[in-house]
């Protein structure tokens, strides 16, 4: 079962333009009540950017990265390779608050 806050390795290619590419960790933000659907909303993680108001920093394993909610996308389960962990409760709370703030502006 795929749950909100899970971190999955997701195959994002093919992409267009400035969309984040490659296979990379992504945090699931779809509510658990929608886990039966064949698509999930995910937020990619990256190590190649600077922290900003809308890109919260997270520690995942032994690495520090950034959540990139402005690159949130819907992906089919077929792109989701395997679960590699989960965000801490505080990180998920920050991510969801960031998304709310982005959409309120």
Each predicted region: which residue ranges?
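Conserved functional hotspots at enzyme active or ligand-binding sites that engage polyanionic ligands
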Residues: 1-105
